[in-house]
Design a protein with these regions (language model features):
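Acyl-donor (CoA/ACP) binding surface of acyl/acetyltransferases
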Residues: 1-42, 77, 81-188
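Hydrophobic residues in alpha-helical segments
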Residues: 39, 48, 70-71
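Conserved GNAT-fold acetyl-CoA-binding loop/helix
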Residues: 43-65, 76
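Juxtamembrane/interface motifs at transmembrane-helix termini
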Residues: 54-57, 66-68, 81-82, 109-111
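Short loop/turn motifs at secondary-structure junctions and domain boundaries
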Residues: 68-74, 160
Length: 188
């Protein structure tokens, strides 16, 4: 079956979602402290290629910018809140959208003290389902450091298949590192 149309996305009104242990909502200014930790904790940063200006204004700008870009359907990002504690545990979303190809790139980051609890697997499952059912995606792609074993396991647990590795494709902390590409396809 050939799809001869380009997808159009609209994230307004914003979709608040749930999974077993996680509530997914729009990122807000009240999430400043958690976003600061996600952006600047070196234990988290070791797997992320982006370099961020370290300032209060940069964190506030990131939060405002994510809302604007979501309203403009350039991306969609959810703040993940653990239901039992109502504490922010991370961020997940589609950071690159390719509507002409019916494809998007999923990305997520968890606070370090939330690693190893199964939250990444649960969130990837829920947001992948949203991508297929609500956004009508054909392909969801993830790009991860092969050294980030927890992230690789979360993807594989949800059926993502390893597509290949780009050698020394990103610079993290002034060192070149590989990127593993994983994909999940909607079966029609």
């Amino acid at each position: 079956m050939y799809l001869r149309y380009m997808l159009t996305f609209s994230f307004s009104p914003f979709s608040h979602l749930h999974s077993e242990r996680i509530y997914y909502r729009q990122l807000e200014e009240k999430d400043y402290d958690a976003v600061y930790q996600l952006r600047y904790d070196p234990r988290v940063r070791r797997f992320i290629s982006s370099e961020y200006e370290k300032s209060d204004e940069a964190v506030s700008h990131f939060i405002r910018d994510s809302k604007i870009k979501t309203e403009n359907a350039e991306l969609v990002m959810w703040c993940m809140e653990e239901k039992s504690t109502q504490q922010v545990i991370g961020i997940i979303g589609y950071f690159r959208l390719y509507p002409e190809h019916h494809r998007a790139e999923i990305g997520y980051v968890l606070l370090h003290d939330q690693w190893g609890k199964g939250f990444a697997s649960e969130a990837v499952e829920r947001i992948s389902l949203y991508g297929f059912e609500e956004m009508n995606l054909h392909t969801i792609e993830a790009r991860v450091s092969p050294l980030n074993i927890g992230s690789v396991k979360a993807l594989e647990k949800n059926g993502y298949q390893w597509e290949g590795t780009l050698k020394e494709s990103y610079r993290v902390n002034d060192e070149f590192t590989d990127t593993a590409i994983y994909s999940l396809f909607q079966r029609i």
